[in-house]
Curated annotation (Swiss-Prot):
The gene is kdkA. Pathway: Bacterial outer membrane biogenesis; LPS core biosynthesis. It is a peripheral membrane protein. This is 3-deoxy-D-manno-octulosonic acid kinase. Its EC number is 2.7.1.166. Its main location: membrane.
Length: 241
């Protein structure tokens, strides 16, 4: 792991080396000129999927951090700087690395960057993470098919492992769970750990689960996904084992 500074930019890479193109790695235009953009996804901003296996060992997802809500209309992507380790991209990078090393199915963090403004008070942030191949989020799948009982149980066990590490996924919803088709089995992944972190006690865990259930119920009406109380019962039974 290598952390370094170039002018007003700070980088961390999951490699023991410095890259000359460090700045360009976080610019979508660079990858477009290289003809290495292999897809994209729209959310608060655009996440770009990149063909980088020959450079980083895996293909990557490039994401810029944007604010949401009313405040995001006034200030779309600047955050107040206090310490490097608490910036949005560095904090998510370190959390993903911890979970990855603990064996949880999360994207491997590849690199993160922050760029301070002229006064050094605010910063903008970006992150490169592993692209999970051959995967879809649950809502996309559940629009066209039901999932077997074992898949719901796998999701429950995964969330339990996360909670046992005292990590709260503050945006735990059906869109942030991916299902990957790997040979003859399906594997669940958790993504998007922005603003997530360690939380003491147990009081929040049931609330976190309920948040996930509400997201499924919301998408039943909005996207007509196939989700039943039995699906939820299978998930929670595995969680409580």
């Amino acid at each position: 792991m290598h952390q370094f500074q170039q002018d007003n930019q700070y980088f961390i890479f999951n490699f023991d080396r410095t890259f000359e193109q460090a700045t360009e790695f976080f610019q979508a235009e660079f990858w477009q000129k290289q003809e290495r953009v292999i897809g994209s996804a729209k959310g608060r901003g655009t996440t770009y999927f990149l063909q980088t296996e020959d450079w980083f060992g895996v293909n990557c997802a490039l994401r810029h951090y944007y604010r949401g809500g009313l405040w995001g209309k006034l200030n779309k992507d600047r955050y107040r700087f206090s310490a490097l380790e608490t910036t949005r991209s560095f904090a998510e990078f370190h959390l993903l690395q911890r979970l990855y090393e603990a064996g949880l199915p999360v994207p491997k963090p590849i690199a993160a960057r922050i760029q301070k403004g002229k006064l050094g008070i605010c910063y903008q942030a970006d992150i490169l993470t592993e692209k999970i191949e051959n995967a879809q989020d649950l809502t996309a799948l559940l629009q066209t098919q039901t999932l077997p009982k074992e898949t719901w149980r796998q999701i429950g066990r995964l969330i339990r492992k996360l909670h046992d590490l005292q990590i709260c996924h503050t945006d735990l919803n059906a869109h942030n769970i991916l299902l990957q088709q790997a040979e003859q089995e399906q594997k669940c992944w958790l993504i998007d750990f922005d603003k997530c972190g360690k939380k003491s006690g147990d009081f929040w865990k049931a609330q976190n689960l309920n948040r996930l259930k509400r997201s499924f119920e919301k998408e039943v009406g909005r996207m007509n996904i196939q989700f039943t109380e039995q699906n939820w019962a299978d998930l929670t039974a595995a969680y409580h084992q």
